[in-house]
Amino acid sequence: MTQFLPPNLLALFAPRDPIPYLPPLEKLPHEKHHNQPYCGIAPYIREFEDPRDAPPPTRAETREERMERKRREKIERRQQEVETELKMWDPHNDPNAQGDAFKTLFVARVNYDTTESKLRREFEVYGPIKRIHMVYSKRSGKPRGYAFIEYEHERDMHSAYKHADGKKIDGRRVLVDVERGRTVKGWRPRRLGGGLGGTRRGGADVNIRHSGRDDTSRYDERPGPSPLPHRDRDRDRERERRERSRERDKERERRRSRSRDRRRRSRSRDKEERRRSRERSKDKDRDRKRRSSRSRERARRERERKEELRGGGGGGGDMAEPSEAGDAPPDDGPPGELGPDGPDGPEEKGRDRDRDRRRSHRSERERRRDRDRDRDREHKRGERGGDRGRDEARGGGGGGQDNGLEGLGNDGRDMYMESEGGDGYLAPENGYLMEAAPE
């Protein structure tokens, strides 16, 4: 189809000129010719220097070694500072240390918010206080957490030393000790490597977790005797007594916890048993009411049949009233013979069957309501039916045995049967027929 295009369009489809060939700048890899083939390094070994003339290798420091070196240098530097400060430290020439050293009490671990008046109020119970000196930082002016209390009498200081240790002040338990800087020879404070604490001796395997006056291991490195050596046994006994007291408290708390758990489980079981007992009693009451209702229904139906039979047998008199369905026995028939449409006829049986079916399908609430209504009707009928019964008995005959049941209908007959039982029995009581007392 392109050959039919005009020349101006055919010019658009014309091919371009070929790319001009230029010779390569370098030879191709397969065209290169090496003067020498590949070889080993054996010819060049003689050019290497002798290993015996080489300088020894320099060993670099690892990270662990560098940290250990810095720690060691820090310890050495601190030891030099401690030695320098120890030469200048003299507690006897301290301007802040005034008063009698044997009447002065050292109080540590004090809350930073505790004031001097609070300390005085807490420690005046052991005796009159002469002076209280709280230590503050020289740089920031904040409290350091310890103080010195000077008593007027040495016996008061001994009493506070014995009883005030571990006392809680502002939420913190303080540590109480005597002033050892001026009383113990060669004593050094904590910042200069001394003190009673053992929490800065070294690593975790050397340090103790809790420092205090009751630590017996702190006396191992003490150069001089204690100013109160007879108090050591008392401190040991007090410490053991406190430990035993803490153990007894823990054991008592564990027993209380177990007792609470047992009481809680017992209450839960008792509550469950009571709930199950209530459910069982409800079920038993419901079954008992159902059985009683069935027995009363059966007894009532039996009494109805017997009354109908008795009324049909005595219907030979002229005063017999027609029943609700109008099926009274004929006057000229025999006294004990029932008519074709008597009380036991198919219509009466059908009505009894329908009535029993309807009553059996009633709920418990409807049955209770019917019984209450029947009881009320029976009560009203008993109040106003005395004269009527006497009139009927006075004008009775063969139909006097009917007692007006045929004219009352089904509801009236039911009420009457509940009040009078057949064959010399009274009305049923709790599902049982009661025999009438002989006259």
Curated annotation (Swiss-Prot):
Residues 255-268 have a biased composition (Basic residues). The modification N6-acetyllysine is found at residue 118. GO terms for cellular component: nuclear speck; nucleus; spliceosomal complex; U1 snRNP; U2-type prespliceosome. GO terms for biological process: mRNA splicing, via spliceosome; positive regulation of mRNA splicing, via spliceosome; regulation of RNA splicing. Its main location: nucleus. Residues 103-181 form the RRM domain. Residues 92-202 are annotated as: Required for interaction with U1 RNA. Residues 60-79, 207-254, 269-286, 294-310, 346-394 have a biased composition (Basic and acidic residues). There is a cross-link at residue 349 (Glycyl lysine isopeptide (Lys-Gly) (interchain with G-Cter in SUMO2)). Residues 192-201, 395-410 have a biased composition (Gly residues). Gene3D superfamilies: 3.30.70.330. Residues 48-79, 187-439 are annotated as: Disordered. The modification Phosphotyrosine is found at residue 126. One of its GO terms (molecular function) is U1 snRNA binding. Signal peptide: none annotated. CDD domains: RRM_snRNP70. The modification N-acetylthreonine is found at residue 2. The RRM domain mediates interaction with U1 RNA. Component of the spliceosomal U1 snRNP, which is essential for recognition of the pre-mRNA 5' splice-site and the subsequent assembly of the spliceosome. SNRNP70 binds to the loop I region of U1-snRNA. This is U1 small nuclear ribonucleoprotein 70 kDa. The lineage of its organism: Eukaryota, Metazoa, Chordata, Craniata, Vertebrata.
